[in-house]
């Protein structure tokens, strides 16, 4: 864990894209969209879901994260920020803001418990309870960029349990470290605004030996109680320039 270091500094790039999900001709004929007819030219296909989406807003931020262990202190210095899109179409107030705060928390699978949507999830590599909670399947041997990895799929032992499902890509060497992870959660009646959530992460080993997340992509499909009923929010994060001095 890099936070065991006395001092830590790194650069962080974040991009959040809010899109209308499952776009149809009927939706584009809504009075809200008739005011901006050029939008139909921006309809695209989501690579992860295969659904038609219409990007509405894009927010980007570049920042520097500074962490000190003792006394405990963390500071975020925003170095650049940009917003683009048609926010006037999606004036959903604090409702959407609260939903995004619940969804887009940082995921650390190296912790025994991962908290998302106000629920604790057992990490698929938890040293405490993963073996008893999940069932694992060795699926394939493949390359992740230049690294030979084993693909291991996992799902809760009990289908009734609320846990992650997905794939781990484990380094095929003596370290057995996680090279990449793709995890998702099922829909649930008491988390009714989230229809689907996927998290994809890439890990790298620093020259100093620590394992860090260098890129993360989180995709959340939501159901809103407004005229925009289905939205997709994608958050992409890239971290670089790790410094411990």
What annotation goes with each model-predicted range?
Residues 1-151, 155-163, 225-245:
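Structured extracytoplasmic
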Residues 184-186, 191-233:
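Short aromatic loop motif centered on NTY/YTY
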Residues 163, 172-184:
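Surface-exposed extracellular loop regions of Gram-negative outer-membrane beta-barrel proteins
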Residues 134-140, 165-167, 184-186, 198-200:
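Short structured motifs
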Residues 3, 166-173, 198-208:
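Extended lipid/amphipathic-ligand handling interfaces
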Residues 62, 179, 197, 204-207, ...:
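Extended, regular secondary-structure scaffolds
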Residues 145-153, 177-182, 210-215:
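Short, hydrophobic/aromatic-rich segments at coil-to-beta transitions
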Residues 141, 157, 173-174, 186:
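Solvent-exposed coil/turn segments that connect beta secondary-structure elements
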């Amino acid at each position: 864990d890099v936070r065991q270091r006395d001092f830590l500094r790194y650069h962080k790039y974040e991009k959040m894209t809010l899109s209308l999900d499952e776009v149809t001709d009927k939706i584009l004929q809504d009075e809200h969209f008739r005011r901006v007819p050029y939008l139909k030219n921006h309809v695209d296909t989501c690579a992860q879901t295969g659904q038609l989406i219409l990007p509405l807003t894009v927010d980007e931020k570049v920042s520097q994260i500074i962490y000190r262990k003792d006394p405990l202190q963390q500071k975020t210095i925003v170095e650049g920020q940009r917003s683009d899109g048609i926010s006037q179409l999606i004036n959903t107030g604090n409702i959407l803001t609260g939903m995004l705060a619940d969804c887009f928390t940082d995921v650390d699978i190296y912790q025994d418990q991962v908290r998302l949507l106000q629920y604790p999830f057992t990490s698929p590599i938890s040293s405490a309870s993963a073996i008893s909670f999940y069932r694992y399947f060795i699926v394939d041997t493949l390359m992740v960029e230049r690294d030979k990895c084993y693909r291991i799929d996992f799902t809760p032992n009990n289908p009734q349990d609320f846990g992650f499902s997905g794939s781990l890509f484990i380094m095929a060497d003596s370290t057995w470290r996680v090279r990449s992870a793709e995890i998702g959660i099922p829909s649930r009646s008491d988390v009714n605004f989230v229809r689907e959530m996927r998290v994809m992460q890439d890990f790298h080993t620093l020259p100093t030996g620590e394992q860090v997340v260098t890129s993360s992509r989180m995709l959340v499909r939501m159901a809103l109680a407004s005229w925009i009923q289905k939205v997709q929010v994608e958050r992409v994060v890239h971290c670089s320039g790790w410094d411990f001095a």
